[in-house]
UniProtKB/Swiss-Prot annotation:
Protein name stated in the entry: Protoheme IX farnesyltransferase
Pathway: Porphyrin-containing compound metabolism; heme O biosynthesis; heme O from protoheme: step 1/1
Note in the entry: Carbon 2 of the heme B porphyrin ring is defined according to the Fischer nomenclature.
Encoding gene per record: ctaB
Predominant cellular place of this UniProt entry's protein: membrane
Amino acid sequence: MKITRIYVRLMAISLSRKLIDYIKLSKPRVISLLDLAAIAGFVLGLPKAINITSIIVSFLAVIIGGSLASGGGMIINGGLEIEKDKKMKRTSWRPTVKGEVGRKEAYAIGSIFIVVGTLIGFLANPLTALFIALGAFIYVVIYSIWLKPRTWWNIVIGGFAGSAAAWAGFAASSGSFTLLSFLLGFLIFMWTPGHFWSLALRFRDDYKNAEIPMLPVLTDERTSAKAIAISNALMVPFALLIGLYAGLIYLIVSTIVSAFLLYVSVKLYLNPTADEAWESFKLSSPYLAIILLTLIIVKLI
């Protein structure tokens, strides 16, 4: 009995460590922002007359299903990029790099997460499941396998993976895809390049060592900073345009935070250093979070 207890305890420890490794690879912070996008889409799509049970099931389906599929895609990405991650200080801690999660294991677990997440999406409706699967497909196949190793357009086109989260949320509550849901998803698409180019400019040497053709690797710092500023400037009108649907409070908040984001973008352009790029990167996620949270709050009150 004692040996059995020890064995069970060791198995539990081993499984818990594996679970922690999978969570690390799934990038919880990224998933939390995608979930926020899904919630914003869900709230925007809520009909005037709702069935409480149906809405709760649909909400849980898109959040749980979307989180699993997104996490699965990132776990597969970890398996795909072991060699590149070894060359980058920023990613050298990942369980796939340390050998704690093997390549085939990452592919298997990630695929299971995506399939299960998509199936859960069907509890809302088929359109929700479609967008959940689409987000994972864009991230794994279009971005990670096809574009990321080949072109600086990788993160631009790959931004549609984030858009799919918002579209899935809207579909879960409304069962439809409309101009409003498109605009919300397109806002996330437009936000993506400035966010990740700022990160790539901060860790330019890392990306260069890994031979990943991010824009800041292929151009000088000033050109990269200019691209970030232009990208953010092009995004802002879409953030404000949603104000036509969301009302005055949202418009005021989005104007204030957008002005601050543009201020930081101009600062980066005038002084394109790693520190300024890091400030731009660290601001961009809270910017999007504030936009989405404001949208959620004003539509619920």
